[in-house]
């Protein structure tokens, strides 16, 4: 890079990044794609840790639990809750928008809660529950989707 002169004013130009196509929009360039991947990954982890926190709370405050399990459950709940917020914060900073992050965390949390409920406690969700999950996720997606810009009327229809 020592042989190439920097552009005037210290700005960044396409010649500074020879492997990046100047024709790609910013959200499709390599750095943005990597950033988007890690944002989604952190949000998925946040949802999983949130589900683990709920499962730990159920373990800690169950009816027939001795003191050791109660203390272990509280420690696990605090730890997984802290991890959930850490990953969610990272996911927010790496995501393209907070809406994408919140939808991803909600999706991950609901599915992981269902899985952990089945594995740890033998809970089976009915079709009505899955229908509700589907409607919640559709609603979140509709609320947070990006609307296209309004169309300009054609010149002959502006009368």
From Swiss-Prot:
Keyword terms: Membrane, Transmembrane, Transmembrane helix
Transmembrane intervals: 37-57, 68-88, 100-120, 124-144
A GO CC annotation given for this chain: membrane
Source taxon at top rank: Eukaryota
Membrane topology: Multi-pass membrane protein
Keyword Ubl conjugation: no
Localization terms from the record: Membrane
Coiled-coil ranges (or none): none
InterPro entries documented for this protein: TMEM42
Designated name of the protein: Transmembrane protein 42
């Amino acid at each position: 890079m020592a042989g190439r002169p920097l552009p005037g004013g210290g700005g960044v130009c396409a010649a500074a990044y020879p492997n990046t196509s100047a024709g790609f929009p910013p959200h499709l360039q390599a750095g943005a794609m990597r950033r988007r991947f890690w944002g989604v990954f952190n949000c998925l982890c946040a949802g999983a840790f949130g589900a683990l926190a709920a499962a730990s709370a159920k373990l800690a405050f169950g009816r027939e639990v001795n003191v050791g399990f109660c203390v272990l459950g509280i420690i696990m709940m605090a730890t997984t809750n802290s991890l959930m917020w850490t990953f969610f914060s990272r996911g927010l900073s790496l995501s393209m928008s907070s809406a994408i992050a919140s939808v991803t965390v909600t999706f991950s949390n609901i599915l992981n809660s269902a899985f952990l409920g089945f594995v740890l406690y033998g809970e089976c969700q009915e079709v009505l529950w899955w229908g509700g999950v589907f409607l919640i996720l559709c609603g979140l997606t509709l609320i947070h989707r990006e609307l296209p810009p309004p169309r300009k009327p054609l010149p002959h229809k502006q009368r």
